[in-house]
Amino acid sequence: MTSRFFYQGGDQSDTDDEPTDIDDEPSDTEPAPTDPNGKSKYLAGGNADDSDDDDGQKRVVKSAKDKRFDEMASTVDQIKNAIKINDWVSLQESFDKINKQLEKVMRVIESQKIPNLYIKALVMLEDFLAQASANKDAKKKMSPSNAKAFNSMKQKLKKNNKQYEDLIIKCRESPESEGEKDEDDEDSDEYESDDEMIEPDQLRKPEPVSDSETSELGNDRPGDDGDAPWDQKLSKKDRLLEKMFMKKPSEITWDTVNKKFKEILEARGRKGTGRFEQVEQLTFLTKVAKTPAQKLQILFSVVSAQFDVNPGLSGHMPISVWKKCVQNMLVILDILVQHPNIKVDDSVELDENETKKGDDYNGPINVWGNLVAFLEKIDAEFFKSLQCIDPHTREYVERLRDEPQFVVLAQNVQEYLESIGDFKASSKVALKRVELIYYKPHEVYEATRKLAEMTVEGDNGEMSEEPKGFEDTRIPAPFVVTLELVARKPTFPENSRTLMDVLVSLIYKYGDERTKARAMLCDIYHHALLDEFAVARDLLLMSHLQENVHHMDISTQILFNRAMSQLGLCAFRAGLVSEAHGCLSELYSGGRVKELLAQGVSQSRYHEKTPEQERLERRRQMPYHMHINLELLESVHLTSAMLLEVPNMAANVHDAKRKIISKNFRRLLEVSEKQTFTGPPETVRDHVMAATRVLINGDFQKAFDIIASLDVWKFVKNRDAVLEMLKDKIKEEALRTYLFTFSSSYDSLSVVQLTNFFDLSLPRVHSIVSRMMVNEELHASWDQPTGCIIFRNVEHSRVQALAFQLTEKLSILAESNERATEARLGGGGLDLPPRRRDGQDYAAAAAGGGSGTSSGGRWQDLSYSQTRQGSGRTGYGGGRALSFSQAGGSGGYSRGRGTGGGGYQNSGRTQGGSALRGPHGDTSTRMVSLRGVRA
């Protein structure tokens, strides 16, 4: 597509920079240049029914491809025109139209490549939408139809742009390198006060400059340059340089710089304002700033403008811009340290002439800015860049090498905030430093420390504000010289634990609640990473985070899940199988491990996520180098469940369904047992299920071999020690399973025989059997002289167990019938024993609900109150925290926090069931109150 940029006729005036409303209208509807015969270029290529055909004019036949592109270009012009007048109804129509035209263009060109014209139109619409959304006053003034179209357009554009995210990001990063350039965009922006580019004709013909502009910046324009190439252009920054340096440095005043600074700020966010150009203009103004305060003020605006380079939420700031942003922040800190009387504040209204005060002013000077907010934004952009870059490329590793630059910036900001006494803000910076350290094992931390030590001062040369040659020839030394006073290299203690202790102590003392909670979770994670399970567990239990985590933000909940996962891995490495299972059981209860750990987007057959939900979830993803190995996590979880469930199933063979430790494991085992043919194990689940089957049969050696054949154990620290521990645990559980299964077949059993069976030492076997006796899992006693176990046959047979169950159910049924009869008779009809009336009201009510009838009076009140009491603990405390403390051997902790110790848990299940069943009973029964009768 040929742009109108190359069809400018000789009659174009030099006053195009100041168009009137009349001039704007035809420029947007493409009144094409005319040929020498006076015929319009575009009318010549019109459709076959054009009236000009009757004049005998020669027609220009266009290909279908050109026609489609011309139609799209015309629609883009309509979009630009609608943007100018803020007409969202027309924008919506044009947007639908250009999408239909895109389908036609794609069919014609027979290619999968999206036209650059369409992508630039999407970028233009996205920018205008963001600008309109930010302007709340303008939104209120919209007409109902315009507001409705605006809201509809917002949804359509978000949904449409999702499939072109990568192309939009590339277009934003390098808009001029995307094939053919869309000069129409620049041509339509000639109404702006400053052109984006200056035409060659304008270079040879100096423009008349107003007297006010002459007095400010000099009236010299670039002279005639006959040797210049035909397509030579000057950017805004070059024009600004020419204007500034035609004057003597002494003639550049604070007012001159301040006025130009305001002009640049007013153009920020305006259509047609180049973001990179604005950053360069502001960067140049820092060179000519007259006072340190003015330079600081402009530097803050430079950093803000650099943040605007990538306005989209899906992309990230270009890495080169990010590095310049870090350098600018370091220069800001240099100025603040060099001039202690300058204070940065974003909460007070500042005087316009505040930055006019120079070095000779000794009083406080206030400059708008927020160091912590800027630091957090830089950290967020670094995080987003790691999310977007492919982790399997060299680029990802190179990006990780930029981390020390952020670390040194955070160190300097924290030191400055502490020096001025702002400890609350410094605690937020300390949290950012903690979040860069907590997930790193000692080896990675040591590598980071060595990388920072090897970094030399010259490594940051590419982050200089301007190219070297440009600085040497055109920009003189800055008017305000800033010394490098803050460190440019980070410092790390030799031990990561030392640094963590210093930072979290500061946060615990001065941070807010969210900051403290996140610091605590990072601390727990780091202790678990260093195999300090007892310390990490105590921190978790004493902080009570597990009770309040549901009320925290999603990122903190993700951090909590990560901490629990690492705690489970730490417990497993330490040989604490039940504790490891307690930490990981709830994580695997819903089958959404990837989502809970923010390591991927989970897909569900029953719940389809909207594009917006999926986009939000992807923004929360953890960078690849922070991931926890999911295969290792699943191996630890299923292996722990196997070691707990196999003896449990053997001990409760007659009532296996009621006493379940891991529902997830039982479900997988049932699926595995239903398979007709079982092939060799491939996945982690297959290996654990195969090991479970052979362990139930008593073959502990084969079970260990299957588990040890998993490749994931290579990711475990001290792999050999962990596998040796795992082998001992499998032997121990095999022994327990054997005793549970065959104890009824023995009157006595020699300990020596058990040691030979299971390859365990005599003291170890003695310890295991004694523990089973103490816990009343095994009804037996020791015969010390002979070294035998004497079994007492108190196990009930199958018939006896069924008889006991029948008796219990009949008793409950009888009581429920008595309650129902009492309610129908109005109370007092049956003289129930006081013990049953007062002590067993709720148990009877539960049975009544199960039989389809329910009684009124006290049991209803009791069930309501008890259900409320139970609900306070059964939701989260009864899930994650309770299972963890039970598994961790901290039964006293969980019972102490409940009501009534172990009875609390037992009644909780019954109460919950009755509360659900009660309302489905007899309505007349529920309406009767027996409180007065019983009194």
UniProtKB/Swiss-Prot annotation:
Q: Where is the composition biased (Polar residues)?
A: 143-154
Q: Which GO terms describe its cellular component?
A: eukaryotic 43S preinitiation complex; eukaryotic 48S preinitiation complex; eukaryotic translation initiation factor 3 complex
Q: Where is this region: Disordered?
A: 1-66, 135-156, 171-233, 823-935
Keyword terms of this UniProt record = Cytoplasm, Initiation factor, Protein biosynthesis
The record, for PROSITE patterns, names:
PCI (PS50250)
The biased composition feature labelled Acidic residues covers 13-28, 176-199
Where is the PCI domain positioned along the sequence?
624-796
Primary location: cytoplasm
Which is a GO BP term held by this UniProt record?
Answer: formation of cytoplasmic translation initiation complex
A molecular function (GO) held by this record is: RNA binding
**The keyword ATP-binding belongs to this UniProt entry's keyword annotation:** no
Q: Extract the InterPro entries matched here.
A: EIF3C (IPR027516), EIF3C_N_dom (IPR008905), PCI_dom (IPR000717), WH_DNA-bd_sf (IPR036390)
Q: Where is the composition biased (Gly residues)?
A: 888-905
UniProt-annotated location(s): Cytoplasm
List the SUPFAM superfamilies hit by this protein, alphabetically: Winged helix' DNA-binding domain
Residues in a coiled coil are none
HAMAP family, from UniProt? eIF3c
SUBUNIT field: Component of the eukaryotic translation initiation factor 3 (eIF-3) complex.
Q: Which family does it belong to?
A: Belongs to the eIF-3 subunit C family.
Question: What does the UniProt function comment say about this protein?
Answer: Component of the eukaryotic translation initiation factor 3 (eIF-3) complex, which is involved in protein synthesis of a specialized repertoire of mRNAs and, together with other initiation factors, stimulates binding of mRNA and methionyl-tRNAi to the 40S ribosome. The eIF-3 complex specifically targets and initiates translation of a subset of mRNAs involved in cell proliferation.
Q: What is this protein called?
A: Eukaryotic translation initiation factor 3 subunit C
Organism per entry: Medicago truncatula (Barrel medic)
Q: What is the lineage of its organism?
A: Eukaryota, Viridiplantae, Streptophyta, Embryophyta, Tracheophyta
